[in-house]
Amino acid sequence: MDGESPFLIALMGMDNLRVLYFHQHFSTPQGAAGIRSYQMARNLVRNGHQVTMVCGSYGGGNTGLDTPFLTGKRTGQVDGIDIIELDLAYSNADGFVKRSLTFLKFAVKSIGIALRHNYDVVFATTTPLTAGIPGIFARWLRRKPFVFEVRDLWPELPKAMEVIKNPVVLGAMSSLEWLSYRSAHRCIGLSPGIVDGIASRGVPRERIQLVPNGCDVDIFRQVGNPWRPEGINDDQFMAVFTGTHGQANGLDAVVAAAEVLQNRGREDIKIALVGDGKLKPQIQEMARAKGLDNIVFHAPVPKQKLVDLMASADIGLQLLANVPAFYYGTSPNNFFDYISAGLPVLNNYPGWLAGLIQQHYCGYAVAPGDAEAFADTLEHAADNKRELKVKGQRAREL
């Protein structure tokens, strides 16, 4: 995997480390979820280390285990990774209370594993923020080295989105965030804003590493059978979004742009929304109410089928709601999938990714909330295939 932390590289240089890795939403490439932790674990195994992955049962994910759960868990080895999968189902469509309870149950069960298991170093990755709890116990009760990877700043992001408003809950989360950072021997941030956010809590810069999301580019070279969702013809321009259909993703921007395109008579441009999430029914109803036939919805697909889909696409959509905390405080999986597939990217919010796209000439960046500009850019891309090809090549190089 590209862009590994010097601290992790140092770990890889040591012999026969036993790594206890906590990621509640872990998935192999057979699932329809991000595989950063899978790639990290595989790299550690390839370098001679033993990795035990502790995870839950994430909707859309696939741990590679299919045996029945016994006493609340099932275990096995997948691609050299020892896996402990806890019987804790989770879906992005679950309500706030149910998701919170699942997070807490995972943390409690993980503490027990951290206190009993034999290992040399513990690695925990968010989200959720509660993933850091077993690392805290490992650090202070067993004096184990603890590496904490931060994928999103909590509680800053849910507070900015007004998903969580209760001051007591926000205060508790802020305390947990501080304790997790201060307990870790090293913190990893996935974006410049996340690194700055960690440092703002008093963590010395020398203990923080920037390791942006990446992708195993070899996966995207293994194209099998390119395909398109039903309703999109081979001669049509296809823009694709892959990922969660939730509040953070701001997919209402797609509906607004699609309406502009349909009013302009651009029947040659289609938008595929691939994934699931709590707001998917709402987005589907918005499109239906406006009579839009240029948006096609599709269920989540495993990584290999995603590779084949992207091989048939013309441009990838990197979309988020217009929340300033997102501008520098996120590192989305789908952006790195797009560029690994050689897809130019259309991004609809300012920040470090917009700057990266413009700097490397690998796509387009439009202002948030501007449906006309969004539609204009899709039209421009559809009408300038030679330029689009160059941007796709630059994306793969990046």
Residue ranges of each PLM-predicted region?
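Acidic anion/phosphate-binding donor-loop and adjacent secondary structure
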Residues: A199, R205-R207, C215-E230, G250
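N-terminal subdomain of nucleotide-sugar transferases
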Residues: P6-D79
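Acidic donor-binding loop of glycosyltransferase active sites
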Residues: H185, M310-Y328, L343
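Membrane-proximal helix-turn-helix segments that form the acceptor-binding/catalytic region
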Residues: V108-G112, N118, T130-L141, P145, ...
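A short, well-ordered alpha-helix in the C-terminal region of glycosyltransferases
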Residues: A373, H380, E387-L398
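Carbohydrate-associated surface elements
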Residues: G193, G214
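Nucleotide-activated donor-binding/catalytic signature segment of Leloir-type glycosyltransferases, i.e.
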Residues: V274, P281-D308, I315
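Conserved donor-binding/catalytic core segment of Leloir-type glycosyltransferases
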Residues: L20, I232-E259, A272, G392
